[in-house]
């Protein structure tokens, strides 16, 4: 099977995979021949693409990451705000993925606009589990992580759909309302005795950045749990690769470029590195352009060697880019999409990454009000790195490039880290 974007879908193509609505009902079944009417309707519903059968892709089989029934049960429990059931589904997701020798993340997600919030939560849960497995988490910690991922956006159910799906940029008031969703999610869980404090904190803090510029508490990376840092990466990746009313989807390659560019600013470098080992940049069944002018379909990805897959070529042959004779052939990155803001609840993220070439200023101050004030003054022209103490600053400097300028207040007797 081959993935075809909805813009490239044509009447007469034969569907290779079922398409479902937000209630889990089959809209169009596999084996159905696409018509112009079907394509228009799928486009209206917001599907980014479809899987089709053709001669070149007949030996490409793409396995769903988790069973469709389990995915639909996950949609339902999030949609119905069933917190206890979410915890049960999280455990089933962990058990399912741990029981498999190889976890396949090759399938491009197929969903409509209407089920975005529910599908997003399930996708983030699966991504978090795979990253957590790669980082050696115990089964208990994986259950906590995946439960938090399923619950992380419950607060969005209280935000009007016209704001969630607004085609244009959010107003300042709308953006502030959107930013309350993590706190709303936490409040829904706060009095639940059977939900651990670790899960609640992960839900509350999943929009924190490692440089302290996130929300709601402005925590530095070393103040965040590993679960928080994992959910943040998975959340942004899935948001970027999703088609929304206000943007086209990023390709996996473009989304990973975004994550890499924001390491040390938004994301934990170690988490992103494990993510890149586990998630293919070019999923199976997608067409790619080669540096020698040819095109091919991704037939097989080889673990950490995501940039050197095996391709199905139009003449029926296989091209293994790991073989020595093919080392001079590379996959060309897709053209950069001219999109609007990549995610409604964090419209400044794309700008933040694109402007990493700006001069960097590190500010060290134990007063959060001072840090916020300085950031407000400088962030339009500089990349601002905030640290609440010398220890945090030293930790940042050990793992990242030195800033162009360092501003710090006179250290208190308890904090002589930068004065030694």
Model-predicted regions and their roles:
Residues 386-404:
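Acidic, metal-coordinating helix/loop segments flanking the phosphotransfer/catalytic sites
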Residues 54-179, 184-193, 198:
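Acidic/His-rich, divalent-metal-binding segments that scaffold phosphate/diphosphate chemistry
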Residues 1-118, 304, 312-354, 370:
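Non-catalytic interface/linker regions that flank or bridge core catalytic/transmembrane domains
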Residues 166-184, 211-294, 303-307:
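Divalent-cation-assisted or electrostatically stabilized phosphate/pyrophosphate-binding catalytic cores
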Residues 408-415:
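Conserved small/polar residues in nucleotide/adenosyl-binding loops
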Residues 365-366, 389:
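Acidic di-acidic motifs
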Residues 368-386:
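Two-component/phosphorelay signaling modules centered on CheY-like receiver
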Residues 352-362, 375, 383:
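Non-catalytic signal-transmission and effector/linker regions of two-component phosphorelay proteins
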